[in-house]
């Protein structure tokens, strides 16, 4: 019972303290306000012609990703085939050993 009274007093204290601070500018919005980027931020976000040659081109990147995906599928299929062949060979060897 003391725990419930303690919780009630804590919550009432928090409610009263938050109602007293409603005049503060910081308590109006916890997320803050949107501010426009300054000149330094705008300069950092602007395109730089010196870096343009390092920019990856969408078509070539898309092709490279596609080739990587195909190679991944081929490797996984090859591994699955190897496992299947080993299992079949083992099964045949056991069957041949039992029959002789």
From Swiss-Prot:
Gene Ontology MF: a single term: protein-membrane adaptor activity
UniProt keyword terms in alphabetical order: Membrane, Mitochondrion, Mitochondrion inner membrane, Transit peptide, Tricarboxylic acid cycle
Chief location category: mitochondrion
InterPro entries tied to this protein: SDH7
Subcellular location: Mitochondrion inner membrane
Biased composition, class Low complexity, residue ranges: 9-19
Annotated GO CC locations: mitochondrial inner membrane; mitochondrion; plastid; respiratory chain complex II (succinate dehydrogenase)
Source superkingdom: Eukaryota
Single biological process term from Gene Ontology: tricarboxylic acid cycle
Disordered as annotated region, ranges: 1-25
Residue range covered by the transit peptide: 1-32
Topology within the bilayer: Peripheral membrane protein
Pathway where this protein functions: Carbohydrate metabolism; tricarboxylic acid cycle
Subunit (UniProt): Component of complex II composed of eight subunits in plants: four classical SDH subunits SDH1, SDH2, SDH3 and SDH4 (a flavoprotein (FP), an iron-sulfur protein (IP), and a cytochrome b composed of a large and a small subunit.), as well as four subunits unknown in mitochondria from bacteria and heterotrophic eukaryotes.
Protein name in the entry: Succinate dehydrogenase subunit 7B, mitochondrial
Annotated organism of origin: Arabidopsis thaliana
């Amino acid at each position: 019972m003391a725990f419930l009274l303690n919780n009630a007093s804590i919550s009432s204290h928090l409610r009263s303290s938050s109602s007293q601070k409603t005049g503060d500018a910081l308590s109006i919005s916890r997320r803050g306000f949107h501010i426009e980027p300054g000149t330094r931020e705008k300069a950092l976000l602007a395109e730089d012609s010196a870096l343009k040659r390092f920019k990856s081109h969408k078509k070539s990147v898309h092709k490279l990703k596609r080739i990587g995906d195909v190679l991944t599928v081929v490797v996984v299929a090859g591994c699955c085939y190897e496992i299947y062949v080993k299992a079949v060979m083992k099964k045949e060897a056991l069957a041949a050993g039992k029959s002789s």
